[in-house]
UniProtKB/Swiss-Prot annotation:
Binds 1 Mn(2+) ion per subunit. Pathway: Carbohydrate degradation; L-rhamnose degradation; glycerone phosphate from L-rhamnose: step 1/3. This is L-rhamnose isomerase. It comes from Klebsiella pneumoniae (strain 342). Homotetramer. Signal peptide: none annotated. It catalyses: L-rhamnopyranose = L-rhamnulose. Its cofactor is Mn(2+). It is found in: Cytoplasm. InterPro entries: L-rhamnose_isomerase (IPR050337), Rhamnose_isomerase (IPR009308), Xyl_isomerase-like_sf (IPR036237). Mn(2+) binds at H262, D294, D296.
């Protein structure tokens, strides 16, 4: 521990103690909050099923930065590099297209054995795993419909894929001793004016009921469903809207996934957390950064990221909210993207934990909105960075921008050698 860091830490502790905040307790609480990193940032959502295929489903990874992972070994190596630069507990979120098999495997026939290497790796790296069926980038999703498809055989294919995915998810939870959150998102929708909006939603409702009909141990597996406003090629109608999935999660008591980019640009998911928590048992968050649409830019330490973190902490939702990330930027170093976004999410959580919430809530209850605003603004100037640097030091990760040196060295030694 350097003298300079220690001095800054002691001064910061005193400053926070003066406003009633126990810094050590804040760091203990931060270690209770894993952030689930998404594997697909590492290869632009290509996966291993058909890496040369086109990305469909109304989503898009833009850019052509060199060095993306081309197989599971490279992706895991890149993830290890990123994980080493991020302090505190982490998880990894996998999509079904990241299976490993010597022979082609139909999506409705995926099995736990196709992900055993991921489980072995997760154990070695002390990570929990989360999962997602991949209802996109496939010939049977080419017309824009999956679980709500009007064709019975195609719809059943996707139902069976999601059922198989749930068993993989439960396998993760059983093997790793921490429940896997499996999120169902489908791109189903239409480009232009839609006459029958009801029938596809009825089919989606029935399909989801069939998907979750097999009872699985909640200690191993948690179901989540995710809405979206629109996607490329589905601008006019999305079957799985916010209202649809809010109703589904409430009536079926599944988890609800709120993605920061899946709403109108003037909406924020931070304001939806407390409302949803009144009706559903759990929330899954996909923290992202939409720029004018669901662009999935790298997460910043901006107002909305901070507001999301503050909602979790202020309402003590540690055990009911699962924090995941969802962005994919192919225009910058992909490892740096992981590190920047995940560290920013953790910084936001730390800043929320360092807030004198009880004092602020009392001012609010007393109607002293002047003092509430004044103290909210003054606390932004408190030396949270010194606390963050100590947290990084305790977890053997770089405290400041020194992590970029590690990324550059890895880029020169490893990424630059890839075709």
């Amino acid at each position: 521990m350097t003298t300079q860091l220690e001095q800054a830490w002691e001064i910061a502790k005193q400053r926070y103690a003066a406003v009633g905040v126990d810094v050590e307790e804040a760091l203990r609480q931060l270690d209770r909050l894993p952030v689930s990193m998404h594997c697909w940032q590492g290869d632009d959502v290509a996966g291993f099923e058909n890496p040369a295929g086109s990305l469909t489903g109304g989503i898009q990874a833009t850019g052509n930065y060199p060095g993306k992972a081309r197989n599971a070994e490279e992706l895991r190596a890149d993830l290890e590099q990123a994980l080493s630069l991020i302090p505190g507990p982490k998880r990894l979120n996998l999509h079904a297209i990241y299976l490993e098999s010597d022979a082609p495997v139909a999506r409705n026939e995926i099995k736990p054995e196709h992900f055993k290497n991921w489980v072995t790796w997760a154990k070695a790296n002390k990570l929990g795993l989360d999962f997602n069926p991949s209802c996109f980038s496939h010939p049977l999703s080419a017309d824009g419909f999956t679980l709500s498809h009007a064709n019975d055989e195609i719809r059943q294919f996707w139902i069976d894929h999601c059922k198989a995915s749930r068993r993989v998810s439960a396998y993760f939870g059983e093997q790793l001793g921490t429940p896997s959150v499996m999120n169902i998102w489908v791109p189903d929708g239409m480009k232009d004016i839609t006459v029958d909006r009801f029938a596809p939603r009825q089919r989606l409702l029935n399909a989801l009921d069939e998907v979750i009909s097999e009872k699985l141990d909640p200690a191993h597996h948690i179901d989540a469903v995710e809405s979206k406003l629109f996607g490329i090629g589905a601008e006019s109608y999305t079957v799985g809207s916010n209202e649809f999935y809010m109703g589904y999660a409430t009536s079926r008591q599944t988890a609800l996934c709120l993605d920061a980019g899946h709403f109108h640009p003037t909406e924020v998911i931070s304001d939806k957390i407390s409302a949803a928590m009144l009706y559903i048992p759990r929330l899954l968050l996909h923290v992202s950064r939409p720029v004018r649409w669901d662009s999935d830019h790298v997460v910043l330490l901006d107002d909305e990221t901070q507001a999301i973190a503050s909602e979790i902490i202020r309402h003590n939702l540690f055990d009911r909210v699962h924090i995941g990330l969802d962005f994919f930027d192919a225009s910058i170093n992909r490892i740096a993207a992981w590190v920047i976004g995940t560290r920013n999410m953790k910084k936001a959580l730390l800043r929320a934990l360092l807030e004198p919430t009880a004092q602020l809530r009392q001012l609010e209850n007393d109607g002293d909105y002047t003092a509430r605003l004044a103290l909210l603004e003054e606390q932004k100037s408190l030396p949270w960075q010194a606390i963050w640097e100590m947290y990084c030091q305790r977890h053997d990760t770089p405290a400041g921008s020194q992590w970029l040196d590690n990324v550059r060295a890895y880029e020169n030694a490893v990424l630059s050698q890839r075709g």
